[in-house]
């Protein structure tokens, strides 16, 4: 007809012309735009600018066509609508444009529908009239309108409707042309009818031109859809159908040019129709008139075609189309022979479906807006012809279907476009059976569109994925006009289309199968008989069944589809009976074969859908929530997705197979396949019966049903619908373990699928689908894995017997792998369980093998591995074992084990892991140390340390690895079993830490006896070691360098001595805690042995230095103690801080994780010691701090922390057991200023424990798991310490004893040194007594203040720094400020300098650790949070209160230097720190340095004094070290160990501070300012600050000035804590220099501490308040900095 021909003519003409005109028209300037000028301009404003343009173009095309050829207008309108959709699709290809196009498409489509409706209404008379005029005008309009229609409208229709045609195109290009014409009939009735008449009648230019234009459109859609092959085929087909090479040439040219031109042209023209139709709401017209317009167009164009012998030819064509459709159905194998092209198409379809899915969802809404966006999309559509064309086809198909449905359904279709449109479209199809070929295609389109609409309402993606191809492919067969060409092409395309149809109509076939088959039968010419339709019904029911399973994923669509299927089948048989009369039985067979082949494809993709079951697994997350519906949906969606992927693969394979096995398929499908299917289904059901747990009967019934279904598609449909209803049951299958009825229902769902799959698979197997079956089976297993995950997990939870049955089922159905697609659906459930079990067992065995390997100690590894093997779930917890054994790998055990590990961790004693680890490690490592200590302490100690560290780390790693591995295994099995498993595993990943933490806690409970024994052994070893350590510590610092390893031994010995003392006092104080403390002591001793190697090197010289300093400082401090009880302690607190810092630095020298662990431990000991000390009277606290400067405890704590790397689980147990580790760390820190901090930490026990968490996170890099463990440990410790804080308040001596050597010493100090504290404060104020008492004096007040500050700052700090560290640090900082205040400000300055270094480190890495925690952690604590809070007692107190604690230390430093300068610089430092908390720590550092320069005179004086004092203190310490070495040696050694570490760490923390120390300790004071600023920097530049601090500390060994650089280096070392081992000597020298600085500060501290102490105490209080305020203000920034 004229429209088609003129459209075609223009299309050829406009290939060159059309670019400009159509583009102009696209812009509204072309002739089409001119034609649409009147209407197009108004339309431009109607839906949207582009929409009006496109609608104007449509209306322009329509207007020209109305003027010239209503047929052309209809085609143009339809094409324009399609083009509008196509253009949108083209833009959709660019996702943003596509989305925009969707909105525009909705507007454009509605407008186009309005235009089409009005145009069709107007064109109804005009079409006939304009048929002659259309040739002339159509030539013009054909260029603009057809280019647009071909590009946009037909592309879209072909992408939706025409895609099927396109698929058929690839089969037969001429048929594609006919199909395109049919599509055009669907889209533009005249086009299809004219092609029908044109191909047969060849109405001159109309048919040729229309067919050529439509063929070009087909070719365009083909090129876009099917690619070069299909293009070539469509080119061949198009000339055949077009009967003119011009059609092909025009198609080729038009494809590139006309499509582009037509798309722009039609958008330009489309505004005309919106003008006409936009009076009515676009959507109303689009849905109401759009569908009616489509049908009207179909009827109009068909009347034209009827005028052009269309009715006869249509009937013939319909019959031929039905035959061709049957041929297509019969030729899914040929179609799959053309699979390569079809595979490409399907690949495109898959990709485009994804793209089209979006359009389908949005098309209804976007159709109106489509025209707006189409214009620019035209080029994109052509550029992305294949994708765009597919998308356009999908979109246009939706639009066309919607329009057709509207035309058919009318207003009712508006309400029920999805259901009524499809349902009503069928009656109109019947009504227009003469026009049913186009109408049929349209109803099919409507059905597809209904599908897509349903898809839009339900699963747009899933159903759209199915429905686009379904729509596209079926529409192509429906649109097939030419008989032979249509038959060949449609057979091919139907092969492709029917697979795609049935693939996508698997869900859509529910709707389309009835309606498409109606269309095929009714629209196909009514030749197809109801029997053929029944085959199709059988095909579609099975497809519907499977896709009910699939669309059960889109269950909302499923009812609609079922309704459509019911409507369609009920109506389709009528049409089929009416129209199928012409269809031959061979066609029925073909259709039967084709439906079965399509169904096979549909079913086969289902098999592969199980591969997308990964997506289903993802969906199974939702499925887990909605197991019944969602699992079915995810399975259906996964199957649909896999139907696409597999459809592509299998289509490539199956087209040939189907071609070869078309008859065999019939036999298989009709006869053998149904019987075989029944047999396979029954056999699989028999075997699957055990699987389905009583599903044998159901499957046997279903097998018989399938047999009957083969004979009776209706019954199959009913069964499929029943399975569709039961398809939710697969979703409910997870709960099917709960009930057999549900499981049976699931079996039913699976069984029909198996039956259909077995049929299809038998066919596929016959056709070589076995390969696909193997692929499909894994995919099924995967898809079913998700279902299995639900089912097996719940099975496991609910019945292991079911799993066993499932295993039996696996063996049975696994044996029946002929139905592998069927079997995998069920088999993978149990098989998966068995496989998972095997995997878990293998993994467990591997863990058993690997864990011992991972574990340094075979003892731990074996026992742990055994325990872990037993409790692969999370950790070696008896409760967890019970949970694991009870629940095994079921998802529930994860939560149960997670819950129980926590519970057990808290309440259950899991001494086996921790104790075994502890015993093995302690007995193994400690005896080795004891044995090897006499020999090469350095080498062996290092070895033992490494062994112990490795063992402890291995234990921790093993435990963590076990927990993680159990998690991983659980995750593996869980991920396989259930998303719940995954979520539980994700929780489990947390639980392992908790479990590890819990394990140590349990260890404490159950391992206390073991701990006592181990502690006794350790004490014996440690005694020897301690003696050697004493000797070594008596050795000069030169030996200390040699004693990098022996230090650890010394520490161990000290720890052992402390452990002995602690054991004695533990026994005295607390028998139950004694074991725990012993266990911790052993851990600490072990940790000391492990960690002490490096600290010892620091320890010996620094101990000497500390003794010297302790002596000097004790003299000074003693005087100061006499003068100021606090001042000595401050200096010693500095020493402790330095000692702690040095030790952690030494520790940090050894391992990063160790330091972190140590930090955690020091934090633990600090928290515990703080609690204990706060519990202890100030004197006790002073004594505990005095003796317990906790140097041993800090070393043990540090050692423990090192040990903790391996013993994170054990450590938590230790920490929980005695809270000793936190107490140790805090006791050590408390040694600095923790007396008050302990008081504050009494309030903060939980916080101190939380600080443990923070320290754990302090070294998150080294030990995240340990950190997590420590976090839970900290939490547990926090809980324990909170409980213990009450206990510790009474037991504080005990717990300090429990803490470690420091705690032991502290306990001794508390008990013995309770009096000794005063003595040592007076007599032994040298290093210990001096520290504690001032610290006690200052700390008790400040501890209260620290409590307030700790609670105040801690709470603010806590948010930033895990709040635990901040609180602890703040508490300590509070205590430390008190100590600082009480201490000589110089000592405070030194402490601040040290603590600033620590703080810098702390800023760098450490969250606001207590000053001593930082000291213990060295830079480590600093590494954690970078909170300036309390690297060292005083400064961290001042600083920790404000996260910019540095200001307070600065004030302290400057209090030493200048209270004015300190106040101003404190504020400056606070300001600097606040900025420094920001990234500019160096700038702040410089500012602090400037402040330091301001104080430089005083700094220089202090520097010289400090240098002199350092030397004198070193000598005095060396002299007094021998004296103090015997009694206070352990304390001194520990103190000095802590001091060196603290010095190293403090110096590391005080990058600037040590630099300032180089200036003097005034510069350290200023350095504190700068260090505080640098702490802020450290926060932002925690790594840099740590490295700088480590570097500076390294240099600090050379010189306090070089300490500046070494502090800078120290942060690096803090970063690389491993480097700290090498830095240990440097730390020793740093400790010496810092001891000198401490001595200087000590000297200074009498001067500064006396006057400035009070002032600074007030100033510190004020500054602490300020700091708290600032810190509260800065906490968030610092927390951010810490995070950053």
Swiss-Prot record:
| Bias-annotated ranges (Acidic residues) | 75-86, 321-342
Basic and acidic residues compositional bias, start-end: 89-105, 212-227, 251-266, 302-320, 468-478, 611-625, 641-660, 696-710, 1198-1210, 1239-1254, 1293-1331, 1467-1492, 1653-1684
The annotated regions of Low complexity compositional bias extend over: 30-48, 497-511, 626-637, 724-741
- Please list where the region (Disordered) is annotated: 1-124, 175-281, 296-353, 421-479, 492-825, 970-1001, 1055-1106, 1121-1211, 1232-1365, 1391-1492, 1568-1684
Sites bearing Phosphothreonine, chain numbering: 330, 628, 871
Tissue expression notes = Isoform 1 is predominantly found in the nervous system. Isoform 3 is testis specific.
**Record region (RII-binding):** 1501-1514
Question: Where, subcellularly, is it found?
Answer: Cytoplasm, Cytoskeleton; Membrane
Q: Report the protein name in the record.
A: A-kinase anchor protein 12
């Amino acid at each position: 007809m004229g429209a088609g021909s003129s459209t075609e003519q223009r299309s050829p003409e406009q290939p060159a012309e059309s670019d400009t005109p159509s583009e102009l028209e696209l812009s509204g300037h072309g002739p089409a735009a001119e034609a649409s000028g009147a209407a197009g301009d108004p339309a431009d404003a109607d839906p949207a600018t582009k929409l009006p343009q496109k609608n104007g173009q449509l209306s322009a095309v329509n207007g020209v066509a109305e003027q010239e050829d209503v047929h052309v207008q209809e085609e143009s309108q339809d094409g324009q609508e399609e083009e509008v959709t196509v253009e949108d699709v083209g833009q959709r290809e660019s996702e943003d444009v596509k989305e925009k196009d969707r909105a525009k498409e909705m507007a454009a489509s509605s407008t186009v529908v309005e235009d089409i409706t009005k145009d069709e209404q107007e064109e109804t008379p005009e079409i006939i009239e304009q048929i002659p005029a259309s040739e002339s005008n159509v030539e013009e309009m054909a260029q603009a309108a057809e280019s647009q229609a071909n590009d946009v409208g037909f592309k879209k229709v072909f992408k939706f409707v025409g895609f099927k045609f396109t698929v058929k195109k690839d089969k037969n290009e001429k048929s594609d042309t006919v199909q395109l014409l049919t599509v055009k009939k669907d889209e533009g009735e005249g086009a299809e009818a004219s092609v029908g008449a044109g191909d047969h009648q060849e109405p001159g230019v109309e048919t040729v031109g229309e067919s050529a234009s439509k063929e070009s459109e087909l070719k365009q859609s083909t090129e876009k859809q099917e690619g070069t092959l299909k293009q070539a085929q469509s080119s061949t087909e198009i000339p055949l159908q077009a009967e003119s090479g011009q059609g092909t040439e025009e198609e080729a040219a038009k494809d590139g040019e006309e499509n582009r031109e037509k798309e722009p042209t039609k958008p330009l023209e489309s505004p005309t129709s919106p003008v006409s139709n936009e009076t009515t709401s676009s959507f109303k017209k689009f849905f109401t008139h759009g569908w009616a317009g489509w049908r009207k167009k179909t009827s109009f164009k068909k009347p034209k075609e009827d005028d052009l012998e269309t009715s006869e030819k249509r009937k013939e064509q319909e019959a031929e189309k039905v035959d061709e459709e049957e041929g297509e159905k019969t030729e899914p194998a040929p179609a799959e022979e053309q699979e390569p092209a079809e595979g490409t198409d399907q690949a495109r379809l898959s990709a485009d479906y994804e793209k089209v899915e979006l359009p389908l969802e949005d098309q209804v809404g976007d159709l109106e807006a489509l025209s707006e966006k189409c214009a620019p999309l035209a080029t994109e559509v052509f550029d992305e012809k294949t994708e765009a064309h597919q998308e356009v086809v999908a979109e246009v198909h939706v639009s066309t279907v919607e329009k057709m449905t509207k035309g058919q359904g009318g207003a009712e279709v508006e309400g029920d476009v999805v259901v009524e449109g499809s349902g009503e479209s069928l009656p109109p199809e019947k009504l227009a059976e003469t026009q049913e070929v186009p109408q049929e295609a349209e109803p099919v389109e409507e059905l597809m569109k209904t599908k897509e609409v349903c898809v839009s309402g339900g699963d747009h993606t899933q159903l759209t994925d199915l429905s686009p191809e379904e729509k596209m492919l079926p529409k192509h067969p429906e649109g097939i006009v030419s008989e032979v060409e249509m038959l060949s092409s449609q057979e091919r395309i139907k092969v492709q289309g029917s697979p795609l149809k049935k693939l996508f109509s698997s869900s859509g076939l529910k709707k389309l199968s009835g309606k498409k088959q109606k269309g095929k039968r009714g629209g196909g010419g009514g030749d197809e008989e109801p029997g053929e339709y029944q085959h199709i019904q059988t095909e579609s029911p099975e497809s519907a069944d499977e896709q009910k399973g699939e669309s059960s994923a889109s269950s909302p669509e499923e009812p609609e589809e079922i309704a459509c299927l019911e409507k369609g089948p009920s109506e389709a048989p009528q049409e089929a009976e009416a129209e199928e009369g012409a269809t031959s039985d061979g066609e029925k067979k073909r259709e039967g074969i084709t439906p079965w082949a399509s169904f096979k494809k549909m079913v086969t993709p289902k098999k592969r859908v199980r591969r997308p079951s990964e997506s289903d697994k993802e969906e199974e997350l939702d499925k887990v929530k909605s197991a019944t519906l969602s699992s079915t949906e995810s399975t259906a969606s996964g199957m649909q997705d896999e139907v696409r992927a597999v459809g592509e693969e299998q289509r490539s394979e199956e087209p040939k197979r189907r071609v070869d096995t078309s008859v065999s398929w019939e036999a298989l499908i009709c006869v053998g396949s149904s019987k075989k299917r029944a047999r396979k289904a029954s056999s699989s059901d028999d075997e699957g019966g055990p699987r389905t747990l009583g599903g044998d009967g159901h499957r046997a019934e279903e097998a018989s049903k399938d047999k009957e279904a083969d004979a009776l598609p209706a019954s199959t449909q009913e069964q499929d619908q029943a399975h569709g209803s039961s398809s939710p049951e697969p979703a409910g299958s997870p709960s099917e373990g709960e009930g057999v009825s549900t499981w049976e229902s699931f079996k039913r769902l699976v069984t029909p699928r198996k039956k259909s799959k077995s049929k299809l698979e038998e066919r596929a197997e016959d056709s070589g689908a076995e390969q696909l079956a193997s692929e499909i089976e894994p995919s099924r297993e995967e898809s079913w894995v998700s279902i299995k995950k639900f089912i097996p997990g719940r099975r496991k939870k609910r019945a292991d017997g079911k799993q066993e049955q499932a295993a039996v089922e696996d063996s049975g159905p696994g044996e029946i792998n002929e139905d592998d697609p069927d079997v995998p659906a069920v088999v993978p459930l149990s098989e998966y369980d068995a496989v998972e079990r095997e995997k878990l067992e293998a993994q467990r065995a591997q863990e058993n093998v690997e864990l011992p390997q991972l574990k340094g100690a075979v003892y731990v590894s074996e026992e742990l591995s055994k325990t872990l093997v037993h409790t692969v779930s999370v950790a070696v917890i008896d409760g967890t074992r019970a949970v694991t054994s009870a629940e095994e790998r079921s998802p529930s055990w994860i939560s149960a084990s997670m819950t129980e590990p926590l519970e057990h961790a808290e309440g259950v004693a899991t001494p086996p892991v921790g104790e075994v680890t502890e015993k093995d490690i302690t007995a193994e490592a400690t005896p080795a140390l004891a044995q090897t200590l006499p020999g090469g302490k350095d080498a062996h100690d290092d070895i033992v340390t490494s062994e112990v560290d490795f063992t402890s780390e291995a234990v921790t790693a093993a435990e963590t690895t076990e927990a993680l591995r159990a998690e991983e295994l659980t995750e593996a099995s869980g991920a396989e079993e259930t998303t719940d498993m995954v979520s539980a595993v994700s929780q489990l990943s947390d639980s392992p830490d908790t479990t590890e933490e819990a394990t140590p806690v349990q260890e404490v409970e159950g391992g206390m006896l073991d701990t006592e024994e181990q502690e006794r052994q350790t004490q014996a070893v440690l005694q020897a070691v301690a003696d050697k350590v004493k000797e070594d510590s008596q050795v000069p610092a030169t030996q200390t360098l040699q004693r990098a390893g022996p230090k650890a031994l010394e520490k161990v010995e000290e720890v052992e001595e402390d452990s002995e003392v602690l054991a004695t006092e533990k026994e005295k104080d607390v028998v139950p805690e004694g074991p725990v403390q012993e266990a911790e002591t052993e851990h600490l001793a072990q940790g000391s042995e492990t960690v002490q190697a490096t600290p010892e090197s620091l320890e010996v010289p620094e101990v000497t230095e500390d003794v010297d300093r302790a002596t000097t400082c004790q003299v000074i401090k003693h005087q100061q103690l006499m003068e100021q009880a606090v001042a000595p302690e401050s200096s010693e607190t500095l020493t402790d801080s330095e000692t702690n810092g040095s030790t952690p630095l030494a520790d940090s020298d050894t391992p990063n994780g160790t330091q972190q662990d140590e930090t955690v431990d020091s934090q633990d000991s600090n928290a515990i010691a703080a609690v204990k000390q706060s519990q202890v009277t100030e004197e006790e606290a002073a004594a505990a701090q005095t003796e317990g400067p906790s140097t041993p405890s800090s070393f043990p704590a540090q050692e423990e922390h090192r040990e903790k790397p391996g013993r994170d689980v054990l450590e938590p147990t230790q920490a929980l057991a005695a809270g000793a580790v936190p107490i140790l760390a805090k006791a050590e820190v408390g040694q600095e200023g923790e007396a008050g901090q302990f008081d504050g930490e009494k309030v903060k026990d939980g916080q101190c424990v939380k600080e443990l968490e923070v320290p754990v996170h302090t070294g998150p890099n080294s030990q995240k798991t340990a950190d997590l463990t420590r976090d839970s440990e900290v939490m547990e410790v926090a809980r324990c310490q909170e409980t213990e804080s009450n206990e510790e308040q009474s037991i504080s001596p005990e717990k300090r004893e429990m803490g470690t050597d420091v705690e032991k010493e502290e306990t001794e100090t508390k008990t013995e040194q309770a009096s000794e504290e005063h003595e040592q404060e007076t007599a032994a104020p040298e290093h210990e007594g001096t520290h504690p008492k001032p610290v006690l004096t200052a700390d008790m007040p400040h501890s209260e203040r620290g409590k307030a500050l700790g609670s105040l700052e801690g709470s603010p700090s806590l948010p930033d720094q895990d709040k635990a560290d901040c609180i602890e640090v703040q508490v300590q900082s509070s205590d430390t400020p008190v100590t600082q205040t009480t201490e000589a400000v110089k000592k405070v300055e030194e402490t601040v300098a040290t603590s600033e270094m620590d703080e810098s480190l702390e800023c760098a890495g450490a969250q606001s650790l207590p000053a001593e925690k930082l000291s213990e952690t060295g830079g480590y604590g600093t590494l954690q949070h970078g909170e300036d809070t309390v690297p060292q007692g005083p400064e961290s107190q001042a600083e920790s209160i404000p996260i910019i604690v540095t200001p307070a230390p600065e004030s302290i430093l400057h209090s030493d230097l200048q209270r004015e300068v300190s106040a101003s610089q404190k504020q400056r430092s606070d300001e600097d720190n606040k900025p420094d908390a920001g990234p500019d720590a160096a700038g702040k550092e410089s500012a602090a340095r400037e402040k330091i320069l301001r104080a430089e005179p005083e700094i220089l004086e202090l520097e010289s004094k400090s240098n002199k004092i350092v030397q004198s203190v070193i000598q005095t310490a060396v002299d007094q070290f021998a004296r103090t070495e015997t009694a206070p040696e352990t304390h001194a050694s520990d103190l000095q160990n802590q001091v060196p570490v603290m010095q190293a760490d403090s110096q590391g923390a005080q990058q600037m501070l040590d630099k300032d120390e180089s200036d003097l300790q005034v510069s350290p004071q200023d350095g504190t300012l700068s260090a505080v600023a640098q702490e802020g920097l450290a926060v932002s530049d925690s790594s840099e600050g740590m490295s700088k601090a480590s570097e500076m500390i390294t240099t600090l060994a050379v010189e306090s000035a070089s300490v500046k650089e070494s502090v800078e280096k120290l942060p690096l070392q803090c970063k690389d804590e491993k480097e700290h081992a090498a830095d240990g000597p440097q730390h020793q020298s740093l400790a010496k220099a810092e001891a000198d600085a401490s001595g200087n500060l000590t000297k200074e501290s009498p001067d500064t501490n006396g006057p400035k102490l009070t002032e600074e105490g007030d100033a510190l209080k004020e500054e602490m308040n300020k700091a708290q305020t600032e810190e509260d203000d800065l906490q968030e920034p610092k927390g951010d900095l810490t995070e950053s």
